[in-house]
C-alpha cells in the first residue's frame, strides 16, 4: 500500500495528458516534440513534497530535464520553468500550493 505522500506526489497518466496538451506536446525549454511520457518534470521536486498536479508539472525532453535537475545552468532552467507556469496559471499560482502537506490527500 502506498503512503499518502507517495500518492500525492505521483504524476498520474491523466495529469501527464493534461500537461502534455497544455505544453503543446513539446519540451518547454527547447521546443522538441516529445511523447506524453515526457510530461513528468516536477517544478517543486517530488523529494521536496512536490505534488503531481498540473500546476507543478511541465514537459521536458530527457536532455533538458537533466539540465534542469543537475546541469550547470540549473538556475536558468528553473527560472524558465517557474516563469512558464506562473504565466500560464497567473496570480493563482504559488509555490506553497504545490507542496504536499499531511492531511491534504
Model-derived regions: residue spans:
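Major-groove DNA-contacting interfaces characterized by cationic-aromatic clusters
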Residues: 1-5, 35-36
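Polybasic, low-complexity binding patches
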Residues: 3-7, 47-58, 66-105
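Short cysteine-rich loop/turn motifs with clustered Cys
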Residues: 10-39, 61-63
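Short basic/aromatic active-site micro-motif
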Residues: 40, 44-45
Amino acid at each position: 500500500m502506498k503512503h499518502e505522500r507517495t500518492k500525492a506526489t505521483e504524476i498520474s497518466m491523466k495529469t501527464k495528458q493534461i500537461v502534455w496538451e497544455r505544453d503543446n506536446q513539446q519540451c518547454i525549454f527547447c521546443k522538441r516534440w516529445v511523447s506524453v511520457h515526457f510530461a513528468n518534470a516536477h517544478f517543486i521536486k517530488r523529494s521536496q513534497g512536490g505534488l503531481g498536479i498540473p500546476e507543478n508539472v511541465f514537459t521536458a525532453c530527457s536532455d533538458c530535464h537533466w539540465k534542469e535537475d543537475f546541469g550547470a545552468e540549473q538556475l536558468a532552467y528553473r527560472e524558465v520553468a517557474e516563469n512558464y507556469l506562473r504565466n500560464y496559471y497567473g496570480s493563482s499560482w504559488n509555490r506553497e500550493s504545490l507542496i504536499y502537506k499531511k492531511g491534504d490527500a
